[in-house]
From Swiss-Prot:
Lineage: Bacteria, Pseudomonadati, Thermodesulfobacteriota, Desulfovibrionia, Desulfovibrionales
Keywords in alphabetical order: ATP-binding, Cell cycle, Cell division, Cell shape, Cell wall biogenesis/degradation, Cytoplasm, Ligase, Magnesium, Nucleotide-binding, Peptidoglycan synthesis
Name of the gene encoding the protein in the UniProt record: murE
InterPro entries in UniProt: Mur-like_cat_sf, Mur_ligase_C, Mur_ligase_C_dom_sf, Mur_ligase_cen, Mur_ligase_N, MurE/MurF_N, UDP-N-AcMur-Glu-dNH2Pim_ligase
GO CC list: cytoplasm
Binding-site residues for meso-2,6-diaminopimelate, renumbered to this chain: 378, 402-405, 453, 457
Motif Meso-diaminopimelate recognition motif, chain ranges: 402-405
UniProt protein name: UDP-N-acetylmuramoyl-L-alanyl-D-glutamate--2,6-diaminopimelate ligase
Amino acid sequence: MNRYPLKALESELEKKHMLICIDSRKVEKGCVFVALPGSSVDGGLFIPDAVSRGAAYIVCRHNEVEYCGSAIPIVVDDPRYTLGRLARIFYNTGNLSMPIIGVTGTNGKTTITYLLEYLFRAKGNRTGVIGTIAYRWPGFSKEAPLTTPQCLDLHAMLAQMQVDKTEIVFMEVSSHALDQRRIAGISFKGVIFTNLTQDHLDYHKDMKEYFHAKARLFFEYPSKNKIMVASMDNQWGRKLAKLVPEIIGFGFKNKPTQVSNYLFGKILSSSRAGLHLQMSFKDKVWELCTPLVGVHNAENLLAVQAISLQLGLAPEDFCCFEKFTGVPGRLERIVNKKQLDIFVDYAHTPDALINVLSALRDVGFKRIITVFGCGGNRDKAKRPLMGKAVAKLSDVAVLTSDNPRNEDPELIMADVLPGLKKAKQIITEPDREKAIRQAIELVSPGDALLVAGKGHECTQQIGFMKYPFSDQSVIRKILGCD
């Protein structure tokens, strides 16, 4: 059987239009089929089907050549990386005129991309956003099934953004996407590292492996004059700065030795009305007021300013954040006739719960009532830690279901309960709507109710099915706001 070098296939793609497929059911005569390795189902199993449907070339690993039949095998070590190379040629994404800014980290990605979008729109730019809530650019918007799209979909989106005259793109880059090479073939003008706290350890072996997945955004996607910024207020950001000396740091602590350039921030005041911050970078000092609350949002604002200064903006441009009202499902206030302080937030990790509950605690609410749960078929080790965070910072803990998926909600709740040992008051109710109703009945003026875990989501996954469910809609229905 004749083999074909990858370079030759790339030359063929440059000369003529050949469809690239990763799903054998979509194969057309003369196309390229890339057999992606998988954790549950391996793409190599579908090579015979792709060949029978007319695939001309099969990108595969050495041990899969025997299945290629009449198709020409392209043997590679990493089919996922190769897919990105081919997609870059097919969609011409190597010649994009718009800069792409990638944001990675456990928490803060969505808020940072929204803040960047708001800032650059205020400057008159046509912006694109790819992230947890939506994929959107001028003339297009759709709900996001994945934080970071699959490789072919991502290249197709970027190509369309270019056609639609998008001028700058802000992209959330998840650890899954980095591990699975979904962003292969993409050149980033700038990258941001926010933080790293426990999450996704059902996927990554441990925190070290989780960190190395995130760090790939800094190491494996080189581009000319790449801007790299990272928080120095957490150990993982400082570790990253040791590995990448060019990083520009930001934080509220004194400048660490790992970085030569550092955006230093101070919180001058924090209240229910918002934040008053002071920043200094090199010889410049400026202040900023915003309706956003919480230290975590102050950190998000530092990240945005750190990279924006490198993209040519000036401190006076940041005054637009005085009118920034927030992100859907991120400490989102539910306005109601009873004037109760009710918030919905996406917090679904121990650290995210600590951040949002601390923000509410710091602005002086009398009591904090928290409705929360843990997702099924996800990192079980974080469940008691989430309970511990809620017990420490809430007056009433209402434990319920999140997206139970294929686990028994009662068993998920049982995993959380050890962390709630020191809670002042515990209510358990697996039915999420009933749990929210019980929590609302407990709220008095001066209290804060936080409904955590689902944020912007409009479905609840039970088993393999997704059912319509929105925390915001449920709250409004209970309060008669609809």
